[in-house]
Curated annotation (Swiss-Prot):
Protein name: Small ribosomal subunit protein uS14
GO BP annotations listed: translation
Assigned keywords, A-Z: Ribonucleoprotein, Ribosomal protein, RNA-binding, rRNA-binding
Lineage: Bacteria, Pseudomonadati, Pseudomonadota, Gammaproteobacteria, Lysobacterales
Oligomer status and interactors: Part of the 30S ribosomal subunit. Contacts proteins S3 and S10.
Gene name as annotated: rpsN
GO cellular component, as recorded: cytoplasm; small ribosomal subunit
InterPro entries reported for this sequence: Ribosomal_uS14, Ribosomal_uS14_bac/plastid
Biological role: Binds 16S rRNA, required for the assembly of 30S particles and may also be responsible for determining the conformation of the 16S rRNA at the A site.
Annotated disulfide bonds: none
A GO term for molecular function: structural constituent of ribosome
Family under the similarity heading: Belongs to the universal ribosomal protein uS14 family.
Length: 101
């Protein structure tokens, strides 16, 4: 089980990333646009730098929904490998079964 503070920190980052997503996208469009002038690009990059660090989506970490484990998480299910195996063995996930060959 991950520390509660780490899980809460990640939830805070998700909220901030969602809150500033539109603003961040518009500033990045101005920066990468060929039509905008050099001064506009500099101004947009300064505004982008002043946004909170945690609002960047690259700072997010995929975590298991049940245990909060940061590694070995299957995006399709949102579960860590251990919890996914337990759920599959109980039959909680329809269509998923243990491989056998």
């Amino acid at each position: 089980m991950a520390k509660i503070s780490m899980i809460n920190r990640d939830l805070k980052r998700k909220r901030l990333a969602k809150k500033f997503a539109d603003k961040r996208l518009s500033l990045k469009k101005v920066i990468s646009s060929y039509a905008s002038s050099y001064e506009e690009k500099i101004e947009a990059s300064c505004k982008l730098q002043k946004l909170p660090r945690d609002s960047s989506p690259t700072r997010l970490r995929n975590r298991c929904e049940i245990s909060g484990r940061p590694r070995g998480v299957y995006c399709k299910f949102g579960l860590g490998r251990n919890k996914l195996r337990e759920a599959a063995m109980r039959g909680d996930i329809p269509g998923l079964r243990k491989a056998s060959w």
